[in-house]
């Protein structure tokens, strides 16, 4: 993967995590809130992993 593609993925997953965090705050009940919190964590983790890969690519 090229650096631009990695950056795109980082931005994509950060955006998804942010949206899920907002949906968790707006959730009508605890189950929905919990679902979106877990999903936000998942997308945040993906963004973090892609950011690490991107940083390694930029250093190399």
Question: How should these model regions be labeled?
Answer:
Residues 1-14:
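Short, charge/polar-rich alpha-helical segments
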Residues 15, 19, 23-26, 30-60:
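Short, charge-rich amphipathic interface segments used for partner binding and complex assembly
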